[in-house]
């Protein structure tokens, strides 16, 4: 039987959150893409559920934040309970969960399948991406003699479609492949990469329940450390559910027999850890168990043609709720780079930065998870959490929120030599949430909400006090230089920069008509663009670490700062951009 043959720009193997975020980028950038998934349908119960603030910023950039927050459960408070050696269970602490500094969201919870559905619905609005279920990848061959040809399709994949009568096979030729196929990644095995790390004897159960309980903090994010008995961690979920993590075995105990784990055992252990309070299970929607292991793939890319993202790269426990977030951020880092290369806008060498930027994040994820498991094990032996561990847990909060990532690959990040506060505008870190007021309308925005994920680079000009003639002249000179950079460096297919200006003058002291055209342009169809000039709301310069003289900040399509310089430093900005857009010379 002759196999059907086809060609595609990008083949994504796996339609979980990591694969779908990669597909979202391809959809936004118009890249012909197929997503294949062996499951017959999206995940309906169970799976990951934690959403950290950085993921919400990503969702907003794609335009799906409101759909997420309409159905999620925000984490509004935390409680810590401990049982001492005498068997007494008491609350040690209870606190509200504040929104992180310079961010619009705190963390929240939503079942993975619902997140997948929301992303899929937005992808389906774009014709360039197709998602196929019940499709299995059977073989992968990389034609190495075609790697240096930009328009070649060197990745040859055999797909088996199990949804057709009797099954059928197809030969797909792809320019690039993304393996988002989970911890047992088929793609990783085809590439010959190995998972390096350790498997522990720590065993946990996880279950989603509808319960009735007299426990006072049942609707908070609650940790219970029970002396000599194990730990319990639970969180309020959507639709009246509660997600419970139940410790069945510590890492320092003898091997726990996995075959003995049942739904009844989990509920019995849960009820025992809550005593003297009662808990009645009205419905069990899902349960599972896992032995904790920490593994990291020894490779993430092959020839910069096949890429691994998410659990295909890093394995850990689901206890701290970071896995889905880090997995999506892997794809958020890769997607714009891959789309830009395919559109012949970006230098193909940019693809090498995926592994150099994301491997340190994966390693940090595993260390963070290892620490939290150690924290649980120690607390259940002693009945309390040691002070040094609590201090370190506090220090890890930026990592837990997704804000500790600091990229340092020199192709995309020009490091600053000046001392900066941790939440300032720093090359390599995500651009923070800073509130400004639209000059024309007075409407308040967070600058970050203006940085949409469409594959464009963003230029943010902190202009200073434009009521001063010298500052206005510097600003307009900068605007003219930016227009020249657009014409000389940016590929025509990319269009223009997303330009945002933030000044410190009174609104009545300047008129938009006095500004360079790039800050107040005219479109033949939509007319004047009033959405480029904003006023500082008294503190945004200080919060950003920007001085009175202002600055120019170049933000990548994924909202990370690439370069920061003085308003007059056209040469510095040009020097940053040229290696990235070098492909224009060959387009």
UniProtKB/Swiss-Prot annotation:
InterPro entries: FAD-bd, FAD/NAD-bd_sf, Phe_hydrox_C_dim_dom, PHOX_C_sf, RIFMO-like, Thioredoxin-like_sf. It is an enzyme of class 1 (oxidoreductase). The keyword Ribosomal protein does not apply. It is a single-pass membrane protein. It catalyses: cyclo(L-arginyl-L-dehydrotyrosyl) + AH2 + O2 = cyclo(L-arginyl-(Z)-dehydro-3,4-dihydroxytyrosyl) + A + H2O. SUPFAM superfamilies: FAD-linked reductases, C-terminal domain, FAD/NAD(P)-binding domain, Thioredoxin-like. The chain crosses the membrane at residues 7-27. GO terms for molecular function: FAD binding; oxidoreductase activity, acting on paired donors, with incorporation or reduction of molecular oxygen, NAD(P)H as one donor, and incorporation of one atom of oxygen. It is found in: Membrane. Its EC number is 1.14.13.-. FAD binds at residues 245, 311. Pfam families: FAD_binding_3 (PF01494), Phe_hydrox_dim (PF07976). One of its GO terms (cellular component) is membrane. Its cofactor is FAD. Coiled coil: none annotated. Belongs to the PheA/TfdB FAD monooxygenase family. FAD-dependent monooxygenase; part of the ank cluster that mediates the biosynthesis of NK13650 C, a highly modified cyclo-arginine-tyrosine dipeptide. AnkC uses as substrate the dehydro-cyclodipeptide intermediate generated by the monooxygase ankB and acts as a hydroxylase that installs the m-OH through a canonical flavin-dependent aromatic hydroxylation mechanism. Within the pathway, the cyclodipeptide synthase ankA acts as the scaffold-generating enzyme and is responsible for formation of the cyclo-Arg-Tyr diketopiperazine (cRY) from L-Arg and L-Tyr. Homodimer. This is FAD-dependent monooxygenase ankC. The gene is ankC.
């Amino acid at each position: 039987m002759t196999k059907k043959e086809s060609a595609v720009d990008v083949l994504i193997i796996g339609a979980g959150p990591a694969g779908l975020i990669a597909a979202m980028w391809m959809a936004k950038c118009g890249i012909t893409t197929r997503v294949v998934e062996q499951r017959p349908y999206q995940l309906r119960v169970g799976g990951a559920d934690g959403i950290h603030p950085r993921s919400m910023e990503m969702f907003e950039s794609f335009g799906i934040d409101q759909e997420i927050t309409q159905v999620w459960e925000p984490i509004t408070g935390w409680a810590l309970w401990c049982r001492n050696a005498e068997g007494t269970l008491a609350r040690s602490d209870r606190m509200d969960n504040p929104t992180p500094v310079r961010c619009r969201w705190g963390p929240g919870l939503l079942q993975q399948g619902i997140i997948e559905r929301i992303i899929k619905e937005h992808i389906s609005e774009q014709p360039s991406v197709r998602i196929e279920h019940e499709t299995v990848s059977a073989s992968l061959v990389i034609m190495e003699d075609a790697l240096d040809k930009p328009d070649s399709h060197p990745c040859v994949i055999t797909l088996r479609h199990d949804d057709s009568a009797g099954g059928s096979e197809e030969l797909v030729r792809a320019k690039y492949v993304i393996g988002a196929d989970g911890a047992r990644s088929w793609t990783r095995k085809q590439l010959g990469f190995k998972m390096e790390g350790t498997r522990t004897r720590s065993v946990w159960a996880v279950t989603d329940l509808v319960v009735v309980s007299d426990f006072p903090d049942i609707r908070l994010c609650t940790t219970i450390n029970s002396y000599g008995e194990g730990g319990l961690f639970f969180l309020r979920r959507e639709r009246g559910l509660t997600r419970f993590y139940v410790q069945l075995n510590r890492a320092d105990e003898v091997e726990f027999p996995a075959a003995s784990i049942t739904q009844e055992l989990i509920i019995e252990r849960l009820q025992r850890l809550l005593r003297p309070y009662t808990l009645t299970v009205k419905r069990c929607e899902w349960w599972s168990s896992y032995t904790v292991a920490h593994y990291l793939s020894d490779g993430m890319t092959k020839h910069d043609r096949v890429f691994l993202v998410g659990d295909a790269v890093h394995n850990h426990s689901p206890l701290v709720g970071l896995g889905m977030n880090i997995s999506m951020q892997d794809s958020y880092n890769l997607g714009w780079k891959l789309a830009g290369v395919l559109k012949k806008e970006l230098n193909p060498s940019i693809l090498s930065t995926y592994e150099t930027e994301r491997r340190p994040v994966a390693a940090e994820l595993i260390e963070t998870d290892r620490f939290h498991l150690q924290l649980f094990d120690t607390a259940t032996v002693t009945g309390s959490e040691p002070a040094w561990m609590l201090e370190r847990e506090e220090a890890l909060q930026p990592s837990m929120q997704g804000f500790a990532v600091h990229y340092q690959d020199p192709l995309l990040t020009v490091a600053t030599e000046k001392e900066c506060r941790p939440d300032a505008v720093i090359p390599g870190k995500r651009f923070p949430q800073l509130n400004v007021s639209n000059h024309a309308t007075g409407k308040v925005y967070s600058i970050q909400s203006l940085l949409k994920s469409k594959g464009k680079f963003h230029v943010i000009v902190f202009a200073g006090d434009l009521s001063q003639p010298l500052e206005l002249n510097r600003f307009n000179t900068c605007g003219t230089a930016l227009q020249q950079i657009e014409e000389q460096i940016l590929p025509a297919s990319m269009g223009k920069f997303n330009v945002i200006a933030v000044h410190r003058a009174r609104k009545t002291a300047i008129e938009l008509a006095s500004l360079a055209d790039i800050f107040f342009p005219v479109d033949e169809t939509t007319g004047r663009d009033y959405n480029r000039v904003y006023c500082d709301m008294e503190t945004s310069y200080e919060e950003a670490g920007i001085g009175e003289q202002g600055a120019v900040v170049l933000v990548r399509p994924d909202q990370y700062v690439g370069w920061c310089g003085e308003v007059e430093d056209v040469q510095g900005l040009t020097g940053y951009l040229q290696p990235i857009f070098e492909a224009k010379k060959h387009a």
